[in-house]
Amino acid sequence: MATIAFVSGGIVNIILDYVFIYQFGWGMAGAAIATVMSPLTSLILITLHKWSPQRVLRFEKFKVKFQDVREIMSIGFSSFLNEFSSAFVMFLFNIVLLNLVGHVAISAYAIVANLNIIVIAIFTGIGQGAQPLLSRYYGLGETKVLRKFVKLSFITYLVAGFLFFLISQVFTGQIIEVFNSEGNDQLAQITRTAIRLYAISFLFTGLNFMGIYYFSAVRKPKMALMISSLRGFFLIVPVLFILVKLLGLTGVWLAMPVVEFVTFGLMLVGYLAYRNYLKKREAVT
């Protein structure tokens, strides 16, 4: 049902974009309406599950407890920061690029950002699929099964990250052509370097996502929050400005790879320490 609702929303968006923009001539207003109709369609389909004989969810009366709300917010805040940091990083990069090179560099970054959005969406999907399983087996105290799913998630992220990196290196020209229909040579040259350098971050971004979803699943929101904060806020600002000072435009494209690599190192230390703690606790019990 979740897949049907999600895919249906996307299909409705595509169809209504064509109808509202080209058939009705509504322009950007039509595109906006089509975009609004997409999640609305998904919501309607999900709501129909209430009347399905196979339903496993139902509405119940409950009292709102501040302690429960606080716990929910503490666990989910790292995911919120993950989403919000993307907008912050884009804003920061645009300011730096505008002052450093100009509008051509911003156009190049727009192409990189679109590619990054696709990669992040897939990484998010992997994490959201793994988190319920991690939470379940952590709650049941089955640490061996938990480690099995952590290993599987790690391998999945590792393979996906390498594939995205490889695609970015091999098909750079084809990716640029999708956005550079006018054949601007300067834009193509800057974007080619930008994609190939920025794509190094894909090797570590997914692994950091794994850390965020893992620590959220095992009720360690502070660790998840630390990872989100490091990669999205606290590291990117100093790293970006230091690399720009040292390397100019090249430093902009290398900023995220450096940030993701450093964050991964710190996340790995935290994960190994917590894994050893779970092993010791398991041995005692």
PLM ranges: what are they?
Residues V12, Q23-G76, L134-I200, L243-T285:
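Short alpha-helical transmembrane segments in multi-pass integral membrane proteins
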Residues T3-V7, L45-L48, K61-L92, L97, ...:
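Hydrophobic faces of transmembrane alpha-helices in multi-pass small-molecule transporters and flippases
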Residues M1-A2, A108-T172, T205-A224:
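Small-residue-rich hydrophobic transmembrane alpha-helices
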Residues V19-W26, A87-N114, I118, R136, ...:
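Helix-terminus/linker motif at the lipid-water interface of multi-pass membrane proteins
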Residues L16-D17, I46, F77, V89, ...:
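Hydrophobic/aromatic residues in alpha-helical transmembrane segments
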